[in-house]
Amino acid sequence: MNRTSPLPAFRFNAAVAGFLAALLIPLTAEAQSGSWKPSEQIKTYAISGNSGIELYRSIGERGPQAGVQAVAHTTFKLTWRREYRPQADGACVLATARPNLTIIYTWPKAPGKLPPDVAASWQRFIAGVEKHERVHGEHILDMVRKIEAYSVGLRAEDDPKCQKVRAVLQQRLKELSDEQRQRGRDFDRQELTDGGAVHQLILALVNGP
């Protein structure tokens, strides 16, 4: 008989630090070149158990809160260095926009000593969890690249104090943020539905050794 239990849900929780902030920080030569790379941080939380079902129950007790109890989640911190340049004709141009992005992954860490068959089952499970969360990370990175592409060269006429161009940018940031969040929700729904990749991972762990 299959052993099942209530399943904590995977949830994507986008924690944003300074996402809409327009930071007027002097730009270095590296920043002006447009080259940048995201940083990555991996957090784990300890769980206990000597079988798949015990490990999963521990996840339910200790997992991160991301709106609901979660198995894992992906968050990020994003700030910007931007340079707005008033033009001689009264317009304003956003000349440079450099992101500082950190993608933060959180997932469970099993005990170091597990029975061999349980350890093998766990490794398959956690590898699938990481694969799932890294797709969310790619969604975040894609959003930031879209923001960067939209930002650089953005121009507003009759804007000597660079207020109009900021307002236009803020509206687009909101649209791209909403798009990314919906993309994450859609992906979770696909993966967690009956027969989905994450659903299968959970069942294999719970019903395994």
Could you describe each region identified by the protein language model?
Residues G128-I140:
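Active-site recognition of the HExxH zinc-binding catalytic motif
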